[in-house]
Curated annotation (Swiss-Prot):
It is a single-pass membrane protein. This is Uncharacterized protein Gp-b*. GO terms for cellular component: host cell membrane; membrane. The chain crosses the membrane at residues 13-35.
Length: 36
């Protein structure tokens, strides 16, 4: 539950700020690792 909350907060901050491709890739990598 806590990880979902953190992920949602990170998702909001990513949406609110412009992000380069490397940030998006690292974010998706973190999500992928957390689901393993």
């Amino acid at each position: 539950m806590l990880t979902i909350y953190i992920m949602l907060n990170n998702y909001k901050s990513v949406i609110l700020s412009p992000f380069p491709c490397c940030v998006l890739k690292s974010y998706l990598t973190v999500i992928y690792i957390s689901f393993l």
